[in-house]
């Protein structure tokens, strides 16, 4: 899912994550912050935190949902 700020400068992407065996990792979401097209930060958050943050970005920060496609991303289990 992609959320974009009103001015279009800040983009927040959220993706489910999977291991190298292609198994989805439950209750974990990859969050990627980008500013003007440059990736700033990646972090793994809980699914509850994902729901909370999406709500806050939309309600409080007035971000718009610009893409609902959420392909699972590979992540190292040791992270």
Q: Model-predicted segments: where are they?
A:
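Short intrinsically disordered terminal tails
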Residues: 1, 75-79
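Short, hydrophobic/aromatic-rich segments at coil-to-beta transitions
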Residues: 1-3, 30
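Acidic, low-complexity, intrinsically disordered interaction modules
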Residues: 11-72
